[in-house]
Amino acid sequence: MPLNRTIKIILTVLLLACGVWLGLNRQFYREALASAFIAFALASVIIIHLRLRPAWIDAALILAGTLFLGAIDYRVLHFRPAIMAWLSFAGLSSLVIFGVGAVWAKGAKQKLLVLGYVPALLFVISEYFADNLLRWTSANHPKALDLYLFSFDSSLGVQISFVMGQVFSAWPWLRIVGLLFYIGLPVPIALIYSGQLLRIREKTIPAMVAFLATGPVGVIFFNLFPAIGPAHLFGQGFPWHPFTIAQSAGIIVEPMAIPGPPNAIPSLHMAWVLLVWWYSRGLRLWERSIAFLFMFFTVLATLGTGEHYFIDLIVAFPFALLLESMCALSLKITDRSRVLAFCFGLAGTLGWFALLRNALHFFWTTPVLPWSFCVATIVVSLLCERELQHRTVSPALEKAVASRALSSTT
């Protein structure tokens, strides 16, 4: 038996064994499979899997794996039923079947499947360990800087997170929809990544690295300016009992202990959907429409749930630009557009940290000032990003896209 075939058999057995072990493990079920966040992360595997390998046999095997895990966990092991666990069962089954398919594929098909499978696996792993990073940050920074962010938001003349919170409270259906988009973040990431992988593979590596790096890099910034969110700061007072603008102007800002893991600043959800939108360029209209919908509802959800302040979303623009510039691997480090994007991304993010910590009195002079800074941050970030994208779309890449489009029509 050839060594290559032996290795494939070993990898297949390992994948099957790991899938069954994780699917039937009580602790993993409780900590991960029953979690909505992990469920959507695993569901994103199905999207990449079936877009790269759209075979009925694979879909049937995913369904069979889902029913098998559900039957054993609930009928035999008597785990506590959870709706999201069914989505996790399907995603876990896809992860195993996708991996086996990548192992046994050949040539260009194998390369395509590996480029899809490895990021899908890493996305799930990063989601699973995200809580550990946040707990580590919370342990190192027991006091959060929420009062600084709340004071800035109030200097705008309107407390946007409280307004959106009241809208969510008045219209529960909108809150449910917003939460689904918020928790379902892995879905557009998988959709856009697999779409670019099918369109032109050279663009997928920067996207993959940026999506994966957002979490760890974001946690580094959380350690520089940790915050929890207005819902945690005000507790039962959110969203119907905010301070008045006059009261907010007089509060003494200082670090304070707030229960919960840090969630800012910046808003990583906002950074992710910005990257999804930016990397969706060149894809079909329906793919870009889904990316836009996730961006729109994520903005509503981050504010309406009270998990973020408005300024969190503003700082996400230069932060996302920073990540895109770091991952623009097709450009030289000295490329002007890449350097400009990197410098503004880093300076914009850290500059906001400095202003929020030391210059709140400046923003309270007139609401025109904080609004002007917010608009300027967004506009300059978008201009730098557009120039960066223009430079990364080289003639060689465009030629490859045109060549693949032509071959698909013949």
Q: Model-predicted segments: where are they?
A:
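Membrane-interfacial catalytic/cofactor-binding modules of polytopic membrane enzymes
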Residues: 219-288
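Juxtamembrane "helix-exit" motif on the non-cytosolic side of transmembrane helices
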Residues: 18-28, 69-81, 103-105, 351-364
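Membrane-interfacial loop-to-transmembrane alpha-helix junctions, especially the N-terminal start
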Residues: 2-12, 49-66, 111-117, 204-211, ...
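Membrane-interface loop-to-helix entry segments
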Residues: 174-188, 259-279, 310, 314
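Interfacial segments of alpha-helical transmembrane regions
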Residues: 113-121, 190-225, 233-234, 290-295
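N-terminal transmembrane-helix/juxtamembrane module of multi-pass inner/ER membrane proteins
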Residues: 55-92, 116-189, 392-410
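Transmembrane helical bundles and short interhelical boundary loops of multi-pass, membrane-embedded
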Residues: 342-406
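Membrane-interfacial alpha-helical segments at the cytosolic side of multi-pass membrane proteins
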Residues: 192-196, 270-288, 318-330
